[in-house]
Regions:
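Short, contiguous alpha-helical
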Residues: 7-23, 27-75, 115-162
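Short alpha-helical interface patches
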Residues: 30-35, 79-92, 108-109, 124-130
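Acidic catalytic patch
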Residues: 102-117
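Helix-adjacent hinge/juxtasegments
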Residues: 65-104
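Basic/polar N-terminal segments that are highly enriched at the extreme N-terminus
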Residues: 1-5
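Exposed alpha-helical structural elements
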Residues: 6, 57-58, 85, 96
């Protein structure tokens, strides 16, 4: 089983990679970023926002027992009209995540977490893995979309980013 220190290391990697992708996406035109490319959430913009909402919803709200306070308007891609707005949301969400990770300890990993969109409770350790894997597979999707545009994606290998 992973420890709080393991998760802090993983989340430091996650944040570094997320920032690299934010920088890469910021170099694209808004038209390219928001174009429907028939992906899971249609556009790279929407996919990236989805990753941020996973962090924000699971860690900044559900894990803190504040599921009723999730700011759904922040989670709606239609409310974003520039990459600057998305970066502001990312910085805000990740500030909460960093604070959460700083306070994480091993006993908290077994805490039961509920989410309004799921029927069952899940241990915090599983929630943290879900957030990590969600980022990985959606960034993989963005990588494929960048390749379709002949754009080299940011480096995201664990070894190069830790």
């Amino acid at each position: 089983m992973s420890t709080a220190d393991d998760f802090r290391r993983i989340f430091a990697y996650n944040e570094k990679v997320l920032q690299s992708f934010s920088n890469a996406l910021s170099r694209l035109s808004w038209e390219t970023l928001s174009k429907n490319m028939e992906a899971s959430h249609n556009s790279m913009k929407n996919i990236f926002i989805h990753i941020l909402t996973v962090y924000n919803g699971w860690i900044n709200y559900n894990a803190l027992g504040k599921s009723d306070s999730i700011p759904w308007e922040q989670h709606d891609p239609k409310n974003y009209n520039s990459m600057n707005q998305i970066v502001e949301f990312m910085l805000s969400a990740m500030k909460g995540v960093t604070r959460f990770m700083d306070e994480l300890n091993d006993p908290k990993l077994s805490k039961k977490i509920t989410a309004p969109w799921m029927e069952e409770e899940h241990e915090l350790s599983d929630v943290l893995m879900q957030v990590t894997l969600e980022q990985a597979h959606h960034l993989g999707e963005i990588i494929a979309l960048l390749w379709q545009l002949n754009i080299e994606p940011p480096q995201m290998t664990w070894i190069d980013n830790t």
